[in-house]
Amino acid sequence: MKYINKLEEWLGGALFIAIFGILIAQILSRQVFHSPLIWSEELAKLLFVYVGMLGISVAVRKQEHVFIDFLTNLMPEKIRKFTNTFVQLLVFICIFLFIHFGIRTFNGASFPIDALGGISEKWIFAALPVVAILMMFRFIQAQTLNFKTGKSYLPATFFIISAVILFAILFFAPDWFKVLRISNYIKLGSSSVYVALLVWLIIMFIGVPVGWSLFIATLLYFSMTRWNVVNAATEKLVYSLDSFPLLAVPFYILTGILMNTGGITERIFNFAKALLGHYTGGMGHVNIGASLLFSGMSGSALADAGGLGQLEIKAMRDAGYDDDICGGITAASCIIGPLVPPSIAMIIYGVIANESIAKLFIAGFIPGVLITLALMAMNYRIAKKRGYPRTPKATREQLCSSFKQSFWAILTPLLIIGGIFSGLFSPTESAIVAAAYSVIIGKFVYKELTLKSLFNSCIEAMAITGVVALMIMTVTFFGDMIAREQVAMRVADVFVAVADSPLTVLIMINALLLFLGMFIDALALQFLVLPMLIPIAMQFNIDLIFFGVMTTLNMMVGILTPPMGMALFVVARVGNMSVSTVTKGVLPFLIPVFVTLVLITIFPQIITFVPNLLIP
């Protein structure tokens, strides 16, 4: 069983490394030998579909898919257990339907993939049913644990018997499933989409993972309206991952992991300490400055909080800082990551909005610096009020030594941005270059990265990618319903009726996102609302590059606000302190964040000036 439990990790890690090698070969072949590999992108995308699916399976086994537990945490224990049982039953149905629709789309696939020698696209669609069967096995494993620990009323044997019965019906009497078509009994017409949206909100807020809740709501909609088109719609589950720009996401995740594994984060912190530690509030400034430097390498807020957090909090405690400020600064400064290039959030926005990722990278830099300065100003005020001590000023020799040790790490953002603008590689390829560069300096310069830790880092990146992959798949499927019913246009009409200017619209959108961010994870929120908000921005002639940066900053506020503030939980865990302590500490730092958000909303030129100047 030990080896079976490692199956996805070994296979996913191997495929991850294969994609890594293929894309490195592509860049070298084009830039060094001037002979691009025409098959490399298609093969990398095909393998990424499998990596994403395997990551979903790992997250099913570990029960790590994003869900909202705000309401369930308020429930009495028995009701919470009953609710969790119902949630697991819905997840079981979702996985079975993944297998069902996976088989149907596989059987219907027939087009060749020319770049891969004309092989059938069945190779892409096979990922859904094959890995979904593995997901079912992992789900049953997880339910064994849930039943033993008293989290569910249903034993694993119930799900095993149910799976056998459902598979028997699927293969021998598939027409029986037609009884589930609601349109056979009642015609709801245009009201169907509202019923589906209501069901989605209810099941999401009682704890169904966000990705699965989107899948259920969309299938419910099709069962009430156009079941005959559901097969074509479910193809988007697979096609959504067959995207070259999305390949940047797992490799920026990998870069952040390698920065921690290869000893790079510690050197970044030491350089920031030598540079800023002697000022009033010095260790707080070091914390914020290190986050700015690290953000230019990983592009992830939670990677910053988890990677640098433990190191930063320990150093601040040793310098005499209170726990609330240690946690508050660490949590607040991590939101710099999604603004400063490279940024995973910007990549996802660029894919959703079909905007230039290079322009988004540049556009986020100035707001990122503004947030940095604003947080430092608040830190200075608090440190002066509480009388925190300064650290001794670093000598010129110490400063030069720390700079020398961190030099290769600091080059990472310059390498990424310089490579993109020089045309050496695309924004997607920049993630591959960043990861490869992290391997080189971790293995050969700092000599702290081993081959085993590299493989384990790939496995960890694959598992995190699985959480993102489920969101991408199901939100694309959900988007089909939104598009068919023109929900985005209906929402836009409401904004048009209420708002009389672009600024009013931006204020309304900011207020909406700030409210939703308190209850919905930032990643989930990005996938859920952007497809509906982007058409509104377009209708009011709002620059979509500016809109992407503004919404990204706004959504990052959500990871700092309870009850769903993920950064609060991450910092509390790595700092060994309570969430309430971190929350208390982060509150004053929300003021400079809000001030910056208001500033860029009123003056969008702060964001758009530089990218428009560099990329007309």
From Swiss-Prot:
Keyword presence, Amino-acid biosynthesis: no
Principal location: membrane
A Pfam match: DctQ
InterPro entries, alphabetized: DctM (IPR010656), DctQ (IPR055348), TRAP_DctM (IPR004681)
Assembly description: The complex comprises the extracytoplasmic solute receptor protein SiaP, and the fused transmembrane protein SiaT.
Function per UniProt: Part of the tripartite ATP-independent periplasmic (TRAP) transport system SiaPT involved in the uptake of sialic acid (N-acetyl-beta-neuraminate). N-Acetylneuraminate can then be incorporated into the lipopolysaccharides as a terminal non-reducing sugar, protecting the bacterium from complement-mediated killing by normal human serum.
Name of the molecule in the record: Sialic acid TRAP transporter permease protein SiaT
Organism: Haemophilus influenzae (strain ATCC 51907 / DSM 11121 / KW20 / Rd)
Gene: siaT
